[in-house]
A protein has these predicted regions:
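Acidic, Ser/Thr/Gly/Pro-rich intrinsically disordered interaction regions
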Residues: 10-119
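Short, contiguous, well-structured surface segments enriched in hydrophobic/aromatic residues
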Residues: 1-8
Length: 119
């Protein structure tokens, strides 16, 4: 697989966002900002946001209670600046996250091979 194919892929998360230009990489960055890196500041990801301000103070496992009647593994509970809306849920599928990471880790081998062949 070529780097451009990895960079422009939408095959894992299938989330192109409101402008239609989203990619797996951009969606992963949005999830990462919500769930771990910048949970209070997600304004870089307008294509995936419903409002100007979003923050996710916590995530919940979608356990046996199936609180919201879908099959995702984890929910990012997202507070927004939208009037009359207490929160939104962003469903996260662990298998998709692992697949995304696996593809990028496997690409490291290609980089190493390229460097070895260059020398």
């Amino acid at each position: 697989m070529k780097y451009s194919e990895i960079k422009n892929s939408t095959n894992i998360f299938n989330k192109v966002g409101s402008d239609g230009n989203g990619t797996d990489e951009k969606y992963f960055e949005y999830l990462r900002s919500l769930c771990s890196v910048h949970p209070v500041e997600t304004s870089r990801h307008k294509r995936y946001q419903d409002n100007d301000f979003e923050c996710s103070p916590y995530v919940l496992w979608n356990n046996s209670l199936r609180l919201f009647n879908d099959d995702c593994d984890i929910y990012a509970i997202v507070y927004t600046s939208k009037d009359n809306e207490s929160f939104k849920r962003v469903g996260i599928y662990i298998e998709q996250v692992f697949k995304y990471v696996e593809i990028r880790v496997n690409f490291i081998e290609k980089i190493i091979d390229y460097i070895d062949n260059y020398q």
